[in-house]
Structures are given as C-alpha cells and as structure tokens.
Amino acid sequence: MSDTTHLDPFADREADNYDNPIPSREYILEFLTQANVPMNRNDLFEALKLEGEEQYEGLRRRLRAMERDGQLVFTRRQCYALPEKLEMVKGYVIGHKDGHGWVRPEGSLNKEGDILLPHHQMRTLIHGDFVLVQPSGTDKRGRKEGRLVRILEERNGQIVGRFFFEYGYSYVVPDDSRIHHDILIPNDLRAGARMGNVVVIEITDRGTRNRGMMGKVVEVLGENMAPGMETQIAIRTHQIPHEWPAEVEQQVAGLTEEVPEEAKQGRVDLRALPLVTIDGEDARDFDDAVYCEAKKGGGWRLWVAIADVSYYVRPDTALDKEAINRGNSVYFPSQVVPMLPEVLSNGLCSLNPQVDRLCMVCEMTVSETGKLSGYKHYEAVMNSHARLTYTKVHEILEGDEELRERYKALVPHLEELHKMYQVLKSARDERGAIEFETVETKFIFNAQRKIESIEPVVRNDAHKLIEECMILANIASASLVEKAKEAALYRVHEPPGEERLTGFRDFLGELGLDLSGGLEPSPTDYANLMKQIGERPDKELIQTMLLRSMKQAVYNADNAGHFGLALKRYAHFTSPIRRYPDLLLHRAIKYLIAKQEGRNQDRWTPTGGYHYSFDDMDFYGEQCSMTERRADDATREVSDWLKCEYMQDHVGEELEGVVANVTSFGFFVRLTELHIDGLVHISTLANDYYHYDPIGQRLVGESFGAIYRLGDAVKVKVLAVNLDDRQIDFELVETSRKLRGQGKTAKKRADEARAKAQGKKEAATKGACGKSPTKSELKPQVEATRRPDSEGRSKPKKTKAPKKRKDQARKKSGKVRDKTK
C-alpha cells in the first residue's frame, strides 16, 4: 500500500473494495488541485508513491474512468488536467431546430451562461446529452461559442417521431424539433411501421460527422392525427414514466378499497366531524377535506384533513421508488398520468364520500384578524360527509335555494368557512402577497375526443376559499418542521434578479407606471402595483410581463421563504396523492409526532413516518423540481398542439385580439375570446422598415410612423397553422392605433433604441476582438420587411435549400406552412 494511504480520507473504502488499493478519485482530484499543473501518468504514479505493475494498471484504469466521467481531461501533451483549470464546462445539450445547439452549464437554471455549439459540432449530439465543452471565443453576434470535448453521458430514453420509407430507405423524423437529425432505420428493424406512423425509436449508432445516426423502432403508436396522439407523443418525448413496473403491480395487487380495521386503531376518530371535499367537477383524486367552526371568544377553528398516503407508500418499497421517479401526477387535457396506481390515487387514499379513510390532520386556530394563532398535527380516521364542487359551493353561498335545501346540514359550516376566508383574504392583502388574476383555458372534447370548444376557467370564491385553507395548512406544516429542525422540503420562491427587475421597470416606465422598493422591492411593492393596474385594459399583459420577471418556485431543503406569497416559511403538505414533496413532509411530521410520544423506532415509525437526512432532501429537492418542470413542459406542449389543431378549422377567419408580445421579427397576438397566441410576422406588415424598441415593447415604422405596441387592440386574420412546430400565423387586418405621420416622438424613441443597440454591439465586438470594429464590419440595425436573420421564429439568412424528403417528412396537413418560430 502506498505512503499516501494515511492522507486519503477514503482509504478505508478503497481497501474494502480492492485487494491492492490505490488512492481514491477524491484524493487524486485534491492532489492535482494542490499540484496546480497537469501531470502525466508516470509522474502521478511516482508522486503518489505507488509500486508494482498491479498498482500501475489500477491507476491507469482509474484515470481513464475519471476521464470518461469528465473529472479529468487528457491533454494533447499526454497529461491529465482538471477541466476547470482548462476553463472547460460540463453541461446539458439544448438542441435548436436550425441545427445548432447550446450547452447549459451543470446547475444553471437560466440561459445567461449558455455556450453555443455550431452546426458541425452537433452532428453526433442529441438534445439532452451531458457533455464536456471548451469555450472557443464568440461568434459574429457576440455569443459565447464552444467546442465539444467529450460526450460524458448520452441522452437516456427513447425518441418519438414520424416514420417514412422512400427510395428503399426507412427513416424517422423526430417530433421534437430540438433533435435536428433524421434517424436511419434498417428495414429489418422497422417493427411493422407504415409510412406516416408515429413511432418510438432507440438510437443504436450515433454515427460520425460524415455518417448519420441509426436506430430501431421499439413501438408503433399509430396514425399521426389519431385522437390523444399528441399526449402520447409528449409523454414519451419528455420521458414521463407511464407504465407501472411489475414490482409495483405486485405490491398493490392485494389492496382493496376498504381501509383495514387495524389501520384505524390508535388514531383520532373524526368520522362524526362534517368534513367535506371541495374540488372541480372532473376531479377523481380527493386529497383534502375541510371543516370550520366559530370559536366562542372570536376567531375560528379550522380542520384540514389530508389523505394519509404515507401509511400505504413506505420508504424504499417498489411503490415509493416509482413515486420518486414520477415526482408528481401529470394532468393533460384529456388524460392523467398519476404518481400512484389508481387503486390508491382514486381509491384507498382518495377521500371519497361516505367511506372511512385514513388522514393526516392539521387542526388550526385562526384569530379574528386572520392570523394563524395555533396548530397541531395528528393521525386520524375520517368519513367525508359530501363530495362538493366549486360550482355548487359558490351557488350555495350565492343563495341557490335548491342546493341549500339539499345540503342544509352543511350550509352553516360552508357559510362559516366563507366568513373566515374573507378575513384570511384581508390578512393576505395586508401582508402584501401578490395575487394574479391570469386566465386559464379548458378544452371541451366531444365523443370522438376532438376539441369542441376552448373556454376560460372561471375562479370563484369557492376556489379561493379552499386555496386559503390549504395555504394556512402549508404554513403550519412548514413552521412545525422548521421549529423542530427536521429535514424536509420547503417550497422556495426567491425575489426577482436584478437584470429582470431592471427590464420590468423599463417596461413599466413606458406605460407611465412605477414599481417602488428600489433595488429590492418587497412583495408589498408588487401588490401595490397590482392595485394600480386593477382596471386597466392591458392588465393581463402587465401581469404576464410581471410573471416573466419572477424566478421559478422550486423545492429546497434550505428555507428561503416564498416571495410571491410574502411568507417566511412555506411547504407543500396538502396533496400527497399527486406530489412527492407532500408525501415526504407527511413522513417527517409523523416522525416528529411519534418522537414526541416516544413511538419512533430509529428512523421510522409504525405508521409510515421517516426521519430523512438533509443530504436526502437535497437530492429530493432537485428531483422533484425537475419532475415539476418536466410536467409543465409536457402539458404546455400538448396544449399548444391542441390549440393549433382547433385553429385549423378557423383559417381565413378574422378575429379580435391584443398584442401580447413584441419581438424584432414581429409581434404575437392573443385572441380575446380563445386566449390563443399567434404571430404577425414583420414581413406581412405594411411596406416599411421597422425598428424594434425592446424597452417600449414596440415596433416602429421608419417612414410612415406606424407603431405596433404591447397591449394594442387589433383585428387579425388566421393565415396559417403549422402543427409540426405548434405555430399559428396571423395577418394584421386593422389596429386601434392610428398612423402618426412621420412621428417625431416615435422616431426619437426608435433612434434611441437603435443607438443603444449599436453601442452594445460595438462594446461586445470590441471586447471580443480587442479593438473597435470598422464601419463596414457593423451590420445595419434596420429591419427590412422580410424574414429576419434571428432566432425565435425566423429562418437563417443563408441556408441550403431543404432536402425534398425533409419537406415531405414534415408535412402533416394541407395547410399553409411557414417555419418562422
């Protein structure tokens, strides 16, 4: 054994694993860090004081493995070096439909640090690959560019696409536009796929820079336009687990819909308490039930009973492992991919009416001013007295006589809930929580599963009442685990970053609005802004820009508060049937209850509680945040597809809308009735040169003074629908804004915007090249009425003509196609 053994903190582990151990990976990395120079294998062998051929071979294998995993880089001088010392970056590939790609550094959540990979660097890469790249300068547009060093981990999972057979060759065009390669399929591996079928494939050969990729068909999904196909594509494209492993099927095989009598023992009996569930009409899994009563001295006592999933789903079981893998249920417009099997999610765990169910209860006291003055958690058994809907409760509160008579025993309790809600709402407003009134839409399907209509979802007081009750239970639960210093996941929403905040303030300034609070505005400052825009016709668009300026909420083991709700602590407790973080919190709370009562056994309790480490929570936080984003991306993609399918029947129609977003290549219009967005491309506007003003969020015509600005009311004609790229193209018919001649103010603003953009470009070019560019090197900032050379929905200025088979592969309908997104 070498003399370095006593210095290696992992020497014992290595000695357990190998007869003739060598230094651990961790020690080698630390050694090279201290050495601060690349070293070849022989020098390392001597420096680590290793001996003999066996240890030399062991070192060779370890260094190769560390190189493979991206921990070390083997340089051209035959030396091993640390990637960070060579300014190399590890990250995930994000493909682009035009053929190039980006590498997002590991751990980064936004695109600010992304590195561009040119087209030729992407020939052997696929969206989702984990790679090592070396920055190699900037491109002509000032974007950081990189060179592929090594693929550290190939994208796992399968690819969905359309199958084609031409000139004796079979190939698949991926449905995901971020995968730019057509995949060649040997004819004996097509699995019976027919021309135009949607198929699932696996890559069998990554190919080279001169030869394309190859794969095999593993599943034929069916015809492209079959009902529900958009959901099946999204499930597989986003790698959402949707089939139950055999071990899970075996574990739930013996379950029935009746709670075993022994499971009810030792619990608080709440079956006589008139708890009710209040959900949407389409709900099938009922997580929560509520009951409220007034206190004699003022204020209220509130019971929030939540399905006790942790009793049935124990740590480290097959059910638990699959729940971790899924992270959450995914709700598509016409299908649900549940986190738990249906026998649990819709049966044994669901708080269905008039049946006994196990539950976790958060019993709270609320003061007359809406403050949470006390809480306690316990395990109970309950029996829901009614399955109510938001619509029914709203109508009962509005005085519907028939419903009030049908539920007369529950009406007083519902009215008490409503009184408490009004006080809670006032308290929420007082603390400065930001309340958004965004419009959500709902797809109405006919018997053939085709879209019949798209309708807005109306939120009434019943929705908000339940929301406030759930928020209160989440606050109480977060307070409990924080006070006990128990490892759990918090729902964290951080304040906006400086760059986005500045951009949002510039936008508000153009509208004559202001966000107070200086460099660190509080939630109250945002809430005051929301009050200012309450009656404005462009309220929804301002809210959209506000949301874009915000960071995304995540799950984290470290509590950093919830900015949007203006809370110091917050966690998810109320939906364990459909969210894994809630299940983790239930286990932690059960452990604390058992610990207080002396019933815990080491890290676990008899009824499903468990004590996790903070390292465990770090892992679960990343996993659950990822699965949440995955679900959001998949459902948004399906929603966009369905909107395009619906709009195919409206091509040629003229509809009212509002300018919802402005870019350098045109502006997006949101239809007033349908809440669907489409693009009015700059090339379809009146013949003029248009300048993009990013601060004012507008396009300004140079010659005739035409202005197209965020929030303008317009009428558009549906020009084309592209199902492939989920794009809808509009043509402007008329606008509420009048032309303003030469428009001195408009031209002044455009000149300012152009000068600012020119200054930024000069600075970027000078920074990249070390000298100022010549006049001939600068591109004009004028946008002509053509498809511009820009990202987004525009085509590159210089590209090869598309291949004939590619055009055929992309066609799915007879509608006009325009790949400009």
From Swiss-Prot:
The UniProt GO MF terms for this protein read: exoribonuclease II activity; RNA binding
The keyword Hydrolase belongs to this UniProt entry's keyword annotation: yes
The EC code for this enzyme is 3.1.13.1
Task: Please note every region of biased composition (Basic residues).
Answer: 795-814
GO terms for biological process?
mRNA catabolic process
**GO cellular component, as recorded:** cytosol
Enumerate the UniProt keywords alphabetically.
Answer: Cytoplasm, Exonuclease, Hydrolase, Nuclease, RNA-binding
Q: Which residues form the RNB domain?
A: 267-593
- Where are the residues of the annotated region Disordered? 739-821
Main localisation: cytoplasm
Identify the InterPro entries for this entry.
Answer: CSD (IPR011129), CSD2 (IPR040476), NA-bd_OB-fold (IPR012340), RNase_B_OB_dom (IPR013223), RNase_II/R (IPR001900), RNase_II/R_CS (IPR022966), RNase_II/RNase_R (IPR004476), RNase_R (IPR011805)
Give the compositionally biased regions (Basic and acidic residues): 748-764, 774-794
**Cleavable signal peptide:** none
| Reaction equation(s) it catalyzes | Exonucleolytic cleavage in the 3'- to 5'-direction to yield nucleoside 5'-phosphates
Alphabetized HAMAP family for the sequence:
RNase_R
Please give the function described in this protein's UniProt entry: 3'-5' exoribonuclease that releases 5'-nucleoside monophosphates and is involved in maturation of structured RNAs.
Can you name this protein? Ribonuclease R
